[in-house]
């Protein structure tokens, strides 16, 4: 949320009988007592303890209060850490938990007391969140985080965040009581092989130094991660090079470090060697520097489905790794929600609480979708079973804030987490001037579509029952309830209005830039929906044909948008409202055209968009991947992770027809010789012919 400039009016506190339930958005406190009154702040105040207290907290407080500060008169505002003279008489009221704080507001004083410096900073953030139009509720809060480390891991594949986006993120984390930012973008060449051994160039080093500075100002641990596993040599030379790189990062101000061994193959996956290296780093570097936080590692087997039941990878780490080293975990699968059974399973093996790397709203495997829906699905009773909880976001930094805000609330106090209230609060925090429009857009842009991980989210829940009822009735009998028709019409109207209003919004320009292709597609889809409903309502020849031709034109425009925007090399294109709204419109259109053809003996094309070819496979990671067509290419969406292709398994692409071909070009994305399989073709699916392929780089 933005720092609110509060103009303090009047000479004394004024009391009213308004409840705290007045649209206040904050992470749910552990204990909150409200008196049912609101207080208007005076123009004069005294801050007691500002010289001893956390300077970041004092600066944040001064940024909120714009009245006149006095040394002799006005309401007293006590700020400080446990033991400071200014808050000593409140010591027994301050929670003993790390980052805990005590906050009290009444007509005599305001107390902002932390158990430690970060706790004081969080007291200020809650104070800012409680302020509403210059008024505060009269409250007493005792609060602390349920999960020790809470934040974000920039660990996705694809376009890394810009420097300015990261700076905005760090401020957002501090405002929402997140204490961790793990810097590990997969496309940073100095983070991973082969350049992890090299220092950052001057420009990049200066940017990292600025990020560390801003992180510190917002009470966020900037964790720099290295990803050496793909080409590391288990010798003293590479140990020294890794320590040298850490030392260079330390000189830039970094005080928190991580080592990633995820998504690799080969010798780098050896758990014994990994443990030896990490213990060496822990003892020679981390523990040798008193201001460095505990080391974090991401294992190669970072989810249950990838752990070898006959192997001992995880148990080796559990037994060999120093107890202070944190071990990351994504859950039962690469993309999954965290359950009690799942976290008990991993904790038993690694002999410590897992550090959760939650892969949502990351979209690097469904880059044609935006994931703007609510955060749900994680067990709310397992805070003590995990040492940390960080979210892996989308490459769209501003759009990711909807989920990040929600994760901040969940990790702060899971037992009081409210999915829908938090989602709505997140939207109003990010775009208060057009919150209703962003909520409409986000409601219909939350599912991932078919994907190799099989992870799906609810979408368009508010209209889903109506859509199902209308479609069932119309397809079966050509009839429908007017109330359902009107509700669908209103939905398409709201979608169009939301898209137009958001496209011209200047309140959060980085957000609008990120989502603009999807907004255009959203508008086109909504307009298509209205035209299709007109076809349902009136099937007279001239009217129907005008609507039909318009729908066909809109389909072409949507195809153009999909083919020309967001053209990343993995899942290019722009998909919107794909789970409920678009299938609904397509099926209504197809049914309306079919009925028209039957009535008039016509032969209008009822095609919407479709995939004529079919993927068949028994390779677990591949069988659910969507196919794409680009010119004369058929693409299987690439996997970010190492694909495990057992002997005897296959991938089959079944074409819609028999095509003459002079050549075939296959790209597996790997330069290693393809000696592990063969290529076969068949015209009837019964008789197969083996074709010899020549290899050039990654192509066959």
Model-derived regions, located:
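Disordered, acidic Ser/Thr/Pro-rich linker "stalks" and the adjacent N-terminal cap
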Residues: 557, 581-677, 681-685, 694-697
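Feature activates predominantly on carbohydrate-active enzymes
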Residues: 95-241, 245, 251-255, 287
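Bacterial Sec-dependent N-terminal signal peptides
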Residues: 1-24
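Active-site-proximal loop/turn and secondary-structure-junction residues that shape catalytic pockets
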Residues: 158, 169, 187-189, 226-230, ...
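Acidic, contiguous N-terminal accessory segments
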Residues: 21-107, 134-141
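Active-site groove signature of glycoside hydrolases
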Residues: 245-271, 293-302
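Acidic, His- and aromatic-enriched active-site or binding-groove loops in soluble protein domains
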Residues: 203-208, 245-254, 315-333
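Substrate-binding groove of N-acetylhexosamine-processing glycoside hydrolases
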Residues: 25-27, 33, 280-308, 313-617
